[in-house]
C-alpha cells in the first residue's frame, strides 16, 4: 500500500499551488477554492477567514527607530543586520554603542596607551594584540642610543650646524640635474636634530625658522637608526671643517661663494687620499679664531680679512648675474661637482661629507629665491626667504628708496586762473586810480571848490563836473557824460534837476553845452538806456513822463546837448581820450 501511495501520480492545484494526488484532486480542488485564499502581497495560501488578520499583522507599514518605513514582517531582520542605530560592542573596551558612533569611538579608544608588563613601554591599545610579537626588540636600540651622549659634539658649534643644514640645501639646489641625494642630507639632519640639547631649544630669537621646523622633523627622524660612535666622531670633525669654510664666504656674492666652496671641497677631497688627511681636517678646527669687527663672529685667522671685506656694511654687494663666468684660474663649479660625483664611487665623497650610500634623486619643484637668486625646493623656499641675508629691511624698502620724497620734488603749480568777477555799474576799474593820480599831478583841469575833494559829490549843484577848457584843435568837443552815483546822491540830483526845469531861466543866460569829463572809468555803463539818436533821448522821455511840468525850454536844452556830437565824432573823442 505504501508503494502504491509513493508511485501514484500528483497534480498541481491552481489555487494553493500544491501537489495533490490525482485520485483526491477533485475533492481537494472543491474544498480549496471554497475555504483557502492566496495573499495578494506575499502570494502565500491562507484560510479566507484569517486573511484580514494576516494582512494586519504581517503586511502593515511600521517605522523603525532610524525613521525607515518597512513591513512588519521585515522589521526584525532590519534591526539585526541593517539598521544604523543598532547596538554594537567596541573591540577595545566592550562598550555598547550605535554603529554610527562606533568607528569614531574605536579610533579614540584605540589611541590610549597601556603599560606593557614585559618591556615596560607604553603601547597603544589598538596595538596590544600585535605587540607581543615585537615586545623587547626596542630595548637594544635604547642601549645603543644611551651609549652616545646627546652632547658628544662641541656645544659651541651646535647652532652653526643648523646653519650648515640650510646651506647644504642651497648647495643641493645649485645644479638641479646634479644635486646631492636626498637620503644623505636627511640622515645628516636626523643626526643634527636628534642631538640638540635643552639650551639649543631656547635659541628662538637667533634661529626662529629652524626652531619652527625642529619639532616636526624630530618626530619624523626619532625612530631612525643612528651611526656608530666612530663614524659620528669623523662626521663631527668634517662638519666643523665645513662650517669654517662656509663662514668664510658668508657675505660674498652667491656666485663667488659657490666657486670658493666647491674649490675647497675639491682640495679637501684630494687631500684625503693621503694618510694624514683626517689630521689636517681636525687641525683646521684647532686654528686661532678671531672675532669680526662688524658681526662679532669668530673666524679663522687667515680668513678674517676676506670676511671683513665682505661683511663691511659700507661695501655694497655686487649685482647678481645669471650668466657670469668663473674667474681665471678657477675651474667651473659644474666640472668640479661632476668630478666629485665620479670619484664618489670609491666612498671618498661620502666619507668627507659624512654620508652613506644613497638612493636616486627624487623629483621635486625647484624655485629661485627672489632676493639672492639661489634655487631651492618648494617646501624650503618660504623659510629661506624669511631669513635671507639679502632680504631688505622692509618689504617695500627698495621701492621707496628709488622714489624721491614728496618734499624734495619741485611742486608743479599752475597759475591760478583769474576768477571772473561780475562788475557792477558803480564799480571802479583797477587802473582808474592810477590814471586819476597822474592827471591830478599835471594840474587841476576841473573847476572844483577847494573845500571838497575831487571824488566827493555831496553838494547837489556840483554833481556834474564840467570842463572849462576849450575844445582842442582838430577835435570836436565831446558830449557831456553821465555819472553813476549812489542812491542818495542820485535822488538829490533828480530833485535838483526838477527844480531847475520848473523855474524860469535867468534873463540873459544862454544855455550852453559844456563837455564833461567823467571821474569814473570809460567802461562805465550808464544806468539809463541809450537811444540811437542821442545819449539822453530816452532819459528826456522818462523825465518827461515822471514830471509832466517840464517846460519846452528845458526839453529844447536837452535835445541840443544830445545833438552836440554825432556817433562818429563820439567814437573819435573816446579814442583820443584813451591815447592820453
Curated annotation (Swiss-Prot):
Pfam families: TRAFD1-XIAF1_ZnF. A zinc finger (TRAF-type) spans 27-103. InterPro entries: Innate_Immune_Apopt_Reg, TRAFD1-XIAF1_Znf, Znf_RING/FYVE/PHD. GO terms for molecular function: zinc ion binding. Residues 197-236, 392-580 are annotated as: Disordered. One of its GO terms (cellular component) is mitochondrion. GO terms for biological process: negative regulation of innate immune response. It comes from the Eukaryota. Keywords: Acetylation, Metal-binding, Phosphoprotein, Zinc, Zinc-finger. Residues 197-209 have a biased composition (Polar residues). The keyword Zinc applies. The modification Phosphoserine is found at residues 190, 326, 414, 429, 469. The modification N-acetylalanine is found at residue 2. Interacts with MAVS, TICAM1, TRAF1, TRAF2, TRAF3 and TRAF6. This is TRAF-type zinc finger domain-containing protein 1. It comes from Bos taurus (Bovine). The lineage of its organism: Eukaryota, Metazoa, Chordata, Craniata, Vertebrata. The gene is TRAFD1.
